[in-house]
Amino acid sequence: DSSESNEIDDVLFLGRRDANSFMKYPQLGN
């Protein structure tokens, strides 16, 4: 199920991006 694996990778990538944005701009977390 390569397609399913890719979807999971996308979710993890977006999660890391959001985490990085939160670290850079914590005020956006409010």
UniProtKB/Swiss-Prot annotation:
Requires vitamin K-dependent gamma-carboxylation for its function. GO terms for cellular component: extracellular matrix; extracellular region. The modification Phosphoserine is found at S2, S3, S5. Keywords: Chondrogenesis, Developmental protein, Differentiation, Gamma-carboxyglutamic acid, Phosphoprotein, Secreted. The keyword Protein transport does not apply. One of its GO terms (biological process) is cartilage development. The keyword Secreted applies. Belongs to the osteocalcin/matrix Gla protein family. Associates with the organic matrix of calcified cartilage. This is Matrix Gla protein. It comes from Prionace glauca (Blue shark). The lineage of its organism: Eukaryota, Metazoa, Chordata, Craniata, Vertebrata.
